[in-house]
From Swiss-Prot:
This is Methionine aminopeptidase 2. Its EC number is 3.4.11.18. InterPro entries: Creatinase/aminopeptidase-like, Met_Aminopeptidase_Type2, Pept_M24, Pept_M24_MAP, Pept_M24A_MAP2, Pept_M24A_MAP2_BS, WH-like_DNA-bd_sf, WH_DNA-bd_sf. It catalyses: Release of N-terminal amino acids, preferentially methionine, from peptides and arylamides. A divalent metal cation 2 binds at D221, H290, E323, E418. Residues 31-42 have a biased composition (Acidic residues). Residues 1-90 are annotated as: Disordered. Binds 2 divalent metal cations per subunit. Has a high-affinity and a low affinity metal-binding site. The true nature of the physiological cofactor is under debate. The enzyme is active with cobalt, zinc, manganese or divalent iron ions. Most likely, methionine aminopeptidases function as mononuclear Fe(2+)-metalloproteases under physiological conditions, and the catalytically relevant metal-binding site has been assigned to the histidine-containing high-affinity site. Residues 10-20 have a biased composition (Basic and acidic residues). Residues 52-66 have a biased composition (Basic residues).
Amino acid sequence: MAAQAAPAEELSKLSVDETKPAPAAANGNDSDAESGDEEAEEGAAAPAAGAAKKKKKRKPKKKKKAPTSQSEPPRVLVSQLFPNNQYPKGEEVEYVNDNLNRVTNEEKRHLDNLNQEFLTDYRHAAEVHRQVRQWAQKSIKPGQTLTEIAENIEDSVRALTGHSGLEEGDALIAGMGFPTGLSINHCAAHYTPNAGNKMVLQEDDVMKVDFGVHVNGRIVDSAFTVAFNPRYDPLLEAVKAATNAGIKEAGIDVRVGDIGAAIQEVMESYEVEINGQMLPVKSIRNLNGHTINHYSIHGTKSVPIVKSNDQTKMEEGDVFAIETFGSTGNGYVHEEGEVSHYAKRGDAAKVDLRLSSAKSLLNVITKNFGTLPFCRRYIDRLGQDKYLLGLNNLVSQGIVEAYPPLVDKKGSYTAQYEHTILLRPTVKEVISRGDDF
């Protein structure tokens, strides 16, 4: 930016008086008296010049421009990239059967407009998820520890929402809606490293990356799978296609059992060749999609990923996580391994806790996570230690739910893809949809 011109009044004070006659000279030389006068004038002019220098205006500092793109790793607040809370919409998909009625119905459109705060929070959370996961897909490489990968994702989510979660109650405003699951190979879900975990991602691993982002309790739950060996591509393609089939089938008044049938048909049309053997891709029949409630990752409705007689209907206003899991193994998972995922139950009965460590930890959980899922690393970063006995007591009392890792048979490979959808009055919005999947 160019320096601004000084005001005319300032310049008039500092300029030499051009109307005053110059002193006479004799034979080209000044007289002694004239010389003395000149010296006096020069002496007077010197401070004036100094004053001019002092009064010279400094160049105004250039204003920092607001960022227009995301950094790598992601650290720019998403709210700065989208002024006035104008976050991108998800993919809007028309309802198949009664779409015309819903789009043209004035009452339905009015209901849609009433949900602006709800939609703004969801779209904000979805944009954070998109930006973080798109960076994660580029940055995750063999040789990284799972702890490094998880913390990179979580630090990015906290930076983009503007809530570090270190002050009491801060994580309840915005941040992680579900701990970063990094489930490898035959482990399908609910694995994240606890403190001290040294596990390293290998070239031949198939890793599910499942994490949630929330803004004001509106949780966006979405997952993808990372594999570096192209032989696993058909497995990933099967699960991605099955998830999209479930999303396509979903809608108001649709029975969840019918969605499961559509998912299974697509999923099990794929095969994958591993070590010269053709293996069918199977839907993991005891894993489901689910509704998402305010500050609660699991609602009361489930969406099977196999054909089912479940007659439960999706309803207007529901928020669903449509997630599918495919496996080269049995297509059935069981609990195995050290627990890392937990959540305080919203329906827990009031219990008189006798263990002081359990009472203290419950207070920490309530004030920092509420009913949002958390993992042990989140408790560690709050400065808590020696809490495991108290945590196990809260689980045994039914106050906190533990979510152990879910595994198929050893030697098998599993994949997962997941999106969050909103069943709005006029349209189905795949809120977490991105250019990546």
